Amino acid sequence: MVADVTVASVAAVLVTASFPCYLYGAWIIIDAETVTWGTLKHHLAYIFAGLALNTVPVVAWMVPQLFDQLGGFAVLHAFFGVQAYALLAFALTGIVPILRAKREYNLYHDPDQDVDLDEIHENMSDWRLRLRAGVIGYVLCWLVAWVLGVARFVTKYRTEF
């Protein structure tokens, strides 16, 4: 059987590798003058890659081991990890209606229309606020969970290296 430290190391590398995907995905949107459908798909490819790199170790290895390790860092690490995913779900309550409204106005395929986003739907500013709050909250909770996870890794496996 594979040693626990090996599996933990692979999980740590995969979760850590997700962060550059998030950063580059964010940069694609920040750098775009207008967000076309192609830009959005390019952005989402990196975001989904980051989510996959992060979620697979969580579901396959961390969650099954959590109840055997409850205490201190493990509880905090799990708490902030769950909060990160909860805030991601909150962000989705903003992005889904935004996507629907922008597609209705054909703003992804014809982005040159002179339309203020807040004018295409009465709730657009609320949806955009949900999206921003959810994404910022996800990233902040993810970073705290990552730091706690690294601290747990170092304290648990430092004698095995």
Regions found by a protein language model. Name each.
Residues M1-T6, T159-F161:
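Short, strongly hydrophobic alpha-helical membrane anchors
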Residues H42-F67:
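A generic, lipid-embedded transmembrane alpha helix
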Residues W146-F161:
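Juxtamembrane boundary at the C-terminal end of a transmembrane helix
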Residues Y108-L131:
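Short membrane-interface loop/juxtamembrane segments of multi-pass integral membrane proteins
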Residues A11-A32:
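N-terminal signal-anchor/start-transfer transmembrane helix
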Residues M62-L99:
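Alpha-helical transmembrane-segment detector that highlights a single hydrophobic TM helix
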Residues P20-A26, A89-D112:
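Membrane-water interface of transmembrane alpha-helices
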Residues I30-L44, L70:
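Membrane-interface helix-boundary motifs at transmembrane edges
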